[in-house]
Amino acid sequence: MHSVMSMLYYTLIIAFLIGTQAAPKSEDNGPLEYPAEHSLPSTQQSNGQHIAKAAPQTTHGRFAWMPDGTEDLNIAMDQNFFKKKRFRSSRVLFSTQPPPVSRKGQSTGFLSSAVSLNRTARTKRTAHPVLHRGEFSVCDSVSMWVGDKTTATDIKGKEVTVLGEVNINNNVFKQYFFETKCRDPRPVSSGCRGIDAKHWNSYCTTTHTFVKALTMEGKQAAWRFIRIDTACVCVLSRKSGRP
């Protein structure tokens, strides 16, 4: 009887140790779209402004924000937070004023470092070279900074609310997204420009990619991958009855 109890005792100890080792040990087990727990610091009220206060992080890496009774939720963040490469995207910009846009909607780059938090260069990223004789784009696209995005689809296909503004060093920074989309699905009557309409059906369509952006879900704010428009491409299909 004594030996049976001893074996049962050791069995329970081994089962406990196995269960302990199987438990998550760090924040790395959280979903990819959420930052580490030290990414969003606790906020404080300053200069009489009402700023939301961060609650402890949940097990899924989300950050709960408790409004202080004001209607407008003002999220405060540390400027050094944006220096983390994993949260940086060349298509996402936090700025106190609209980014400059050159003629035909082409971006001329980020604002100066005193105004813009993103240091990734985007100088004329979407500017096309001067077209010589006989050189034309298959599809016409338009690029612009979008600063009024309120909702978006995340990487899981769920609709989320995009965080419009954040408070950094008592300055309100707006979240902008650099998007590219088709100007016209059919730049010519037959579809895409330069395509043999005798053998092919064609049309221009906008394609998407996912970028990390600050979003809100209820009273929780976190980084998530959201879908934005990034290019205009030509879609081809062979006409039926032709080899």
Curated annotation (Swiss-Prot):
Disulfide bonds join 139-204, 182-232, 192-234. Residues 1-22 form the signal peptide. Keywords: Cleavage on pair of basic residues, Disulfide bond, Growth factor, Secreted, Signal. Residues 40-49 have a biased composition (Polar residues). The keyword DNA damage does not apply. GO terms for biological process: cell surface receptor protein tyrosine kinase signaling pathway; modulation of chemical synaptic transmission; negative regulation of neuron apoptotic process; nerve development; nerve growth factor signaling pathway; neuron projection morphogenesis. Transmembrane segments: none annotated. Changing residue 224 to G: Impairs receptor binding. The keyword Secreted applies. Residues 26-50 are annotated as: Disordered. Residues 23-125 form a propeptide. Changing residue 200 to F: Diminishes receptor binding. InterPro entries: Cystine-knot_cytokine (IPR029034), Nerve_growth_factor-like (IPR020408), Nerve_growth_factor-rel (IPR002072), Nerve_growth_factor_bsu (IPR020425), Nerve_growth_factor_CS (IPR019846). Belongs to the NGF-beta family. Nerve growth factor is important for the development and maintenance of the sympathetic and sensory nervous systems. Extracellular ligand for the NTRK1 and NGFR receptors, activates cellular signaling cascades through those receptor tyrosine kinase to regulate neuronal proliferation, differentiation and survival. PANTHER family: BETA-NERVE GROWTH FACTOR (PTHR11589:SF10), NERVE GROWTH FACTOR NGF -RELATED (PTHR11589). This is Beta-nerve growth factor. The gene is NGF.
